[in-house]
Every structure is written in C-alpha cells, then in structure tokens.
Design a protein with these regions (language model features):
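Gly/Pro/Ser/Thr-rich low-complexity, intrinsically disordered segments predominantly at protein N-termini
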Residues: 1-146
Length: 146
C-alpha cells in the first residue's frame, strides 16, 4: 500500500477531530485502527465511529455491531473503496459507509438494505444526518475539508 498522501492525512485528521468534538461522549472515534469483520479480515478505515466500550477494546477490535459508521478517504484506492470495500462492509452489516473522493472533493454515502448498500448518495455540499444520529446535521464541507 502506498504511503498516505498529505491531503489524505490532513482531511481525515481534521474530520476525526471535528467528529470527536461534535459527538463527544456518545461515541469513540478511532482513526486508522483495525476493525474485526466476520470474514476474518481486519481493515483499518480512516475513521471508525464506534460504541464506547472502554477496556473491552483491549480484548478485541470493534465488531460490525459496535460500529455506527465508517469513513474512508480515497485517492488512488477510490475504485476499490467504492466497489469491493462497500460490498464487504454491507455484507458484514456495517450500518453506513462514507467515502470521500479526494480528487473531486465529494462525499459518497452508502446505506444498507438487506445486506447490500441500496442507497448511494453523492454530496458536494449541504448537510448529512448519520443514520445512527438523526438528530445531528454534519456539514459535508467538514468531512471533505474543501
């Protein structure tokens, strides 16, 4: 895997800090840390918004049932993140998956239905409400850092 570029590092770091402040104690923000999937893989999404399980994470990484949503920043890996990873995450029950296209500066939001991501929204501005926190409106610009 090629090293993380400057835009990737900056955008994911800024969004992680923003989400940590916005969501506070409601969640744990994990940046570039493994999650454990039922297919025995442990991908490391750029940002995982997960349940606060405290010391439980000393024994295991977050499982799909502990995950509110995932965010991936993509440049060179865009095709893989939009296709292969979205199918894997949907199949294991990740409730929501966001991909930031760093080339075009837009946010692609995947939402599930029956084990597949049936909804795919592409946003360049405005606000988005995460499925797990419909009371929140997150400015798309804060996530894509445009």
């Amino acid at each position: 895997m090629p090293p993380e570029g400057e835009a990737h590092a900056y955008c994911s770091d800024e969004a992680g800090e923003y989400l940590a402040k916005l969501l506070g104690d409601r969640v744990k923000i994990r940046q570039a840390k493994p999650i454990t999937l039922s297919n025995d893989s442990e991908p490391e999404p750029d940002i995982a918004i997960v349940q606060r399980l405290g010391r439980d994470y000393r024994e295991h990484h977050p499982y799909p049932e502990n995950i509110f949503w995932l965010i991936k920043y993509a440049n060179s890996s865009l095709e893989k993140d939009l296709d292969k990873k979205s199918k894997i995450y949907a199949a294991v029950g990740i409730p929501e998956y966001w991909v930031v296209n760093l080339k075009k500066l837009h946010l692609v939001v995947f939402r599930p239905l029956d084990g597949e991501y049936a909804t795919k929204l592409t946003l360049t501005s405005g606000e988005i409400q995460p499925l797990a926190f419909p009371d929140l409106s997150i400015p798309v610009a804060q996530i894509i850092n445009s």
